[in-house]
Amino acid sequence: MMVKFLLLALVFGLAHVHAHDHPELQGQWKTTAIMADNIDKIETSGPLELFVREITCDEGCQKMKVTFYVKQNGQCSLTTVTGYKQEDGKTFKNQYEGENNYKLLKATSENLVFYDENVDRASRKTKLLYILGKGEALTHEQKERLTELATQKGIPAGNLRELAHEDTCPE
Protein backbone atom coordinates (compact mmCIF):
# COMPACT_ATOMS: atom_id res chain seq x y z
CA MET A 1 0.00 0.00 0.00
CA MET A 2 1.24 1.61 0.76
CA VAL A 3 0.72 4.10 -0.09
CA LYS A 4 -0.87 4.88 -1.83
CA PHE A 5 -2.17 3.54 0.14
CA LEU A 6 -1.21 3.77 1.45
CA LEU A 7 -0.94 3.04 2.31
CA LEU A 8 -2.69 4.87 3.37
CA ALA A 9 -6.57 10.19 7.40
CA LEU A 10 -8.28 10.15 10.21
CA VAL A 11 -11.67 8.82 10.29
CA PHE A 12 -11.60 8.41 13.98
CA GLY A 13 -9.50 11.14 15.57
CA LEU A 14 -6.63 13.48 14.86
CA ALA A 15 -3.81 12.19 17.01
CA HIS A 16 -0.71 11.00 15.18
CA VAL A 17 0.24 7.44 15.99
CA HIS A 18 3.40 5.45 15.53
CA ALA A 19 3.24 2.11 13.74
CA HIS A 20 5.44 0.34 16.28
CA ASP A 21 3.04 1.36 19.07
CA HIS A 22 0.20 -0.51 17.42
CA PRO A 23 0.50 -4.27 17.13
CA GLU A 24 -2.97 -4.27 15.54
CA LEU A 25 -1.37 -2.65 12.49
CA GLN A 26 -0.04 -5.98 11.25
CA GLY A 27 -2.36 -8.51 9.74
CA GLN A 28 -5.19 -8.89 7.28
CA TRP A 29 -6.91 -5.69 6.11
CA LYS A 30 -9.24 -4.60 3.34
CA THR A 31 -9.64 -1.17 1.79
CA THR A 32 -12.88 0.32 3.10
CA ALA A 33 -12.61 3.74 1.45
CA ILE A 34 -10.23 6.10 -0.33
CA MET A 35 -10.31 9.87 -0.75
CA ALA A 36 -8.06 11.96 -3.01
CA ASP A 37 -7.82 15.53 -4.21
CA ASN A 38 -7.22 14.21 -7.74
CA ILE A 39 -10.25 11.94 -8.05
CA ASP A 40 -9.03 10.40 -11.33
CA LYS A 41 -6.26 8.65 -9.38
CA ILE A 42 -8.77 6.59 -7.37
CA GLU A 43 -11.55 6.05 -9.91
CA THR A 44 -12.28 2.51 -11.08
CA SER A 45 -9.01 1.09 -12.44
CA GLY A 46 -7.21 4.29 -11.38
CA PRO A 47 -3.52 3.87 -10.52
CA LEU A 48 -4.06 4.53 -6.80
CA GLU A 49 -7.23 2.48 -6.38
CA LEU A 50 -5.70 -0.19 -4.14
CA PHE A 51 -7.42 -3.19 -2.63
CA VAL A 52 -5.26 -3.89 0.44
CA ARG A 53 -4.93 -7.39 1.83
CA GLU A 54 -2.10 -7.42 4.37
CA ILE A 55 0.33 -5.21 6.27
CA THR A 56 3.49 -6.51 7.92
CA CYS A 57 6.29 -4.71 9.75
CA ASP A 58 9.93 -5.77 9.80
CA GLU A 59 12.94 -4.57 11.78
CA GLY A 60 10.92 -2.96 14.56
CA CYS A 61 8.57 -1.50 11.95
CA GLN A 62 11.38 0.34 10.20
CA LYS A 63 10.00 -1.37 7.09
CA MET A 64 6.29 -1.69 6.37
CA LYS A 65 5.18 -4.12 3.68
CA VAL A 66 1.76 -3.67 2.15
CA THR A 67 0.23 -6.34 -0.05
CA PHE A 68 -2.63 -5.21 -2.26
CA TYR A 69 -4.42 -5.77 -5.54
CA VAL A 70 -4.74 -3.30 -8.37
CA LYS A 71 -7.43 -3.87 -10.95
CA GLN A 72 -6.95 -3.14 -14.66
CA ASN A 73 -9.49 -4.18 -17.27
CA GLY A 74 -11.29 -6.26 -14.66
CA GLN A 75 -8.16 -8.26 -13.81
CA CYS A 76 -6.73 -8.23 -10.27
CA SER A 77 -2.93 -8.12 -9.97
CA LEU A 78 -1.30 -8.80 -6.60
CA THR A 79 1.48 -6.40 -5.60
CA THR A 80 3.63 -5.91 -2.50
CA VAL A 81 5.50 -2.69 -1.79
CA THR A 82 7.88 -1.89 1.05
CA GLY A 83 7.84 1.48 2.77
CA TYR A 84 10.87 2.66 4.71
CA LYS A 85 10.49 4.74 7.86
CA GLN A 86 11.97 8.21 7.49
CA GLU A 87 14.00 10.25 9.98
CA ASP A 88 10.90 11.88 11.52
CA GLY A 89 9.93 8.44 12.86
CA LYS A 90 6.36 8.77 11.53
CA THR A 91 6.53 8.90 7.74
CA PHE A 92 7.16 5.97 5.42
CA LYS A 93 8.41 6.33 1.86
CA ASN A 94 8.03 3.95 -1.07
CA GLN A 95 8.00 3.91 -4.84
CA TYR A 96 4.71 2.94 -6.44
CA GLU A 97 3.16 4.97 -9.25
CA GLY A 98 5.74 7.59 -8.30
CA GLU A 99 6.97 8.51 -4.83
CA ASN A 100 4.75 8.06 -1.79
CA ASN A 101 5.17 9.58 1.65
CA TYR A 102 2.56 8.26 4.05
CA LYS A 103 1.71 8.16 7.73
CA LEU A 104 -0.52 6.06 9.90
CA LEU A 105 -2.88 8.57 11.50
CA LYS A 106 -5.19 6.29 13.44
CA ALA A 107 -5.11 2.63 14.43
CA THR A 108 -7.74 0.56 16.19
CA SER A 109 -8.46 -3.15 16.04
CA GLU A 110 -11.18 -2.37 13.46
CA ASN A 111 -9.69 0.38 11.29
CA LEU A 112 -6.47 1.98 10.10
CA VAL A 113 -6.31 5.45 8.58
CA PHE A 114 -3.35 6.49 6.43
CA TYR A 115 -2.54 9.84 4.85
CA ASP A 116 -0.41 9.67 1.69
CA GLU A 117 1.15 12.22 -0.61
CA ASN A 118 1.95 10.75 -4.00
CA VAL A 119 4.06 12.51 -6.61
CA ASP A 120 3.78 10.70 -9.93
CA ARG A 121 6.31 10.52 -12.74
CA ALA A 122 4.86 13.69 -14.27
CA SER A 123 5.44 15.53 -10.93
CA ARG A 124 1.68 15.68 -10.23
CA LYS A 125 1.01 15.66 -6.49
CA THR A 126 -2.00 13.83 -5.06
CA LYS A 127 -3.16 13.86 -1.43
CA LEU A 128 -4.92 10.68 -0.33
CA LEU A 129 -6.62 9.12 2.66
CA TYR A 130 -6.80 5.33 2.82
CA ILE A 131 -9.19 3.76 5.29
CA LEU A 132 -8.65 0.07 5.95
CA GLY A 133 -10.96 -2.23 7.85
CA LYS A 134 -12.17 -5.78 8.12
CA GLY A 135 -14.61 -5.62 5.20
CA GLU A 136 -17.40 -3.52 6.70
CA ALA A 137 -18.77 -0.36 5.13
CA LEU A 138 -18.26 3.01 6.81
CA THR A 139 -20.86 4.18 9.29
CA HIS A 140 -22.52 7.59 8.89
CA GLU A 141 -20.44 8.91 11.80
CA GLN A 142 -17.21 7.59 10.26
CA LYS A 143 -18.06 9.27 6.95
CA GLU A 144 -18.62 12.58 8.73
CA ARG A 145 -15.27 12.35 10.52
CA LEU A 146 -13.54 11.34 7.33
CA THR A 147 -14.91 14.26 5.35
CA GLU A 148 -13.83 16.65 8.14
CA LEU A 149 -10.33 15.21 8.03
CA ALA A 150 -10.26 15.33 4.24
CA THR A 151 -11.16 19.01 4.30
CA GLN A 152 -8.31 19.67 6.75
CA LYS A 153 -5.91 17.86 4.41
CA GLY A 154 -7.08 19.77 1.31
CA ILE A 155 -9.11 16.90 -0.14
CA PRO A 156 -12.64 17.78 -1.37
CA ALA A 157 -15.29 16.21 0.86
CA GLY A 158 -17.12 14.83 -2.18
CA ASN A 159 -14.13 12.79 -3.37
CA LEU A 160 -14.97 9.73 -1.29
CA ARG A 161 -14.87 6.26 -2.87
CA GLU A 162 -16.27 3.51 -0.71
CA LEU A 163 -14.77 0.19 -1.76
CA ALA A 164 -16.01 -2.28 0.86
CA HIS A 165 -18.61 -3.68 -1.54
CA GLU A 166 -16.67 -3.13 -4.80
CA ASP A 167 -13.72 -5.35 -3.93
CA THR A 168 -13.97 -8.46 -6.12
CA CYS A 169 -10.30 -9.46 -5.95
CA PRO A 170 -9.30 -12.74 -4.23
CA GLU A 171 -8.89 -12.79 -0.48
Swiss-Prot record:
One GO CC annotation: extracellular region
| Signal sequence segment | 1-19
Top-level taxon? Eukaryota
Q: Does the keyword Cell wall biogenesis/degradation apply?
A: no
Q: List the disulfide bonds.
A: 57-61, 76-169
Role:
Binds the chemical odorant 2-isobutyl-3-methoxypyrazine.
Q: What is the designated name of this protein?
A: Odorant-binding protein 1b
